[in-house]
């Protein structure tokens, strides 16, 4: 049975991932990693720093994208009196749930339906953020479930025109499905201190059961990094598999192409049925 409620992976992992699992030495789990003594978080954050050209100290690592989200919301909403997060009108239900966990509240900005898709109105996002002045602004790109996304230029325009004390969290869990470009990430997080961009191995890399998420944050957040970091290190098995996944882009890009073919077939066939409207 294929479950469709959490966008899980119904294809095979890459050969490199399978090999990393088979070759993993279980005795490794008898010891903590010592990389924290070198001033690093993980062998994974070191590799991510090389891939994304972001300083290792500005890279976050956690138990899936979920932990990236929870850590950010819990930390920033619990500091000070402003406990409001601004989220998309149609979005993952979990966003407002996490805000409620730490006594926060949420308000929503609208998304707009076009002929066969939804879209952000960047000017309205800016206007809402300046008027409400939330502690956090959440942008999902692409947004789940509507699928609309923001360009790097649009993210930059939002960052340039909102209060600098509003922390912006960009959820890019599905970003690799719509673009191979990641060159915009480093310039954005190096320019804007109030920005977090979060990604995961759960969607494009098809490893939701591994529970590995990562993110990038602007400079000047040593206390938040200390809040997130694991002094005794991360799961060493997960680290080994994560490294293999990050070296398997060709495999997962081929899988994504198959998914897109299936999606277009689904769109065509379902769109031919009376009473159904299919969105891009």
Range-by-range predicted roles:
Residues 78-80, 159-163, 188-192:
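Short, conserved loop/helix-junction motifs that constitute active-site signature segments
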Residues 12-14, 102, 194-272, 278:
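PLP-dependent aminotransferase class I/II
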Residues 116-179:
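Active-site phosphate-binding strand-loop segment of PLP-dependent enzymes
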Residues 55-59, 83-84, 165, 172, ...:
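Short acidic capping loops at alpha-helix termini that bridge into adjacent secondary structure
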Residues 75-139:
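PLP-dependent aminotransferase-like
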Residues 4, 137, 171-173, 198, ...:
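Structural scaffold positions in well-ordered secondary structure
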Residues 1-68:
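N-terminal small-domain helix-loop-helix segment of the aminotransferase-like
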Residues 65-74, 170-174, 178-179, 188:
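Glycine/small-residue-rich loop that forms an oxyanion/phosphate-binding "nest" at active or ligand-binding sites
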């Amino acid at each position: 049975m294929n479950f469709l409620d959490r966008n899980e992976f119904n294809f095979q992992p890459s050969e490199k991932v399978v090999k990393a699992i088979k070759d993993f030495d279980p005795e490794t789990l008898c010891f903590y990693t010592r990389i924290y003594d070198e001033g690093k978080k993980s062998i994974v954050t070191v590799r991510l720093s090389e891939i994304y050209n972001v300083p290792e100290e500005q890279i976050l690592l956690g138990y899936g994208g979920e932990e990236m989200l929870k850590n950010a919301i819990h930390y920033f909403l619990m500091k000070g009196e402003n406990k409001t997060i601004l989220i998309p009108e149609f979005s993952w239900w979990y966003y407002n749930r996490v805000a409620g966990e730490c006594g926060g509240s949420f308000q929503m900005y609208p998304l707009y339906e076009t002929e066969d898709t939804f879209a952000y109105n960047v000017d309205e996002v800016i206007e809402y953020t300046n008027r409400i002045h939330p502690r956090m602004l959440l942008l999902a790109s692409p947004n789940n479930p509507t699928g609309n996304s923001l360009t790097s230029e649009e993210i930059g325009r939002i960052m340039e025109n909102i209060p600098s004390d509003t922390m912006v969290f960009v959820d890019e869990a599905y970003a690799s499905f719509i673009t191979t470009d990641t060159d915009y990430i480093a310039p954005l997080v190096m320019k804007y201190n109030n920005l977090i961009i979060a990604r995961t191995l759960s969607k494009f890399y098809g490893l939701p059961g591994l529970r590995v998420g990562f993110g990038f944050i602007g400079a000047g957040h040593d206390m938040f990094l200390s809040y997130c970091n694991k002094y005794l290190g991360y799961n060493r098995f997960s680290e080994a598999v994560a490294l293999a996944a990050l070296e398997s882009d060709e495999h997962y890009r081929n899988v994504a192409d198959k998914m897109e073919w299936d999606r277009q077939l689904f769109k065509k066939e379902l769109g031919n049925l009376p009473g159904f409207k299919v969105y891009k």
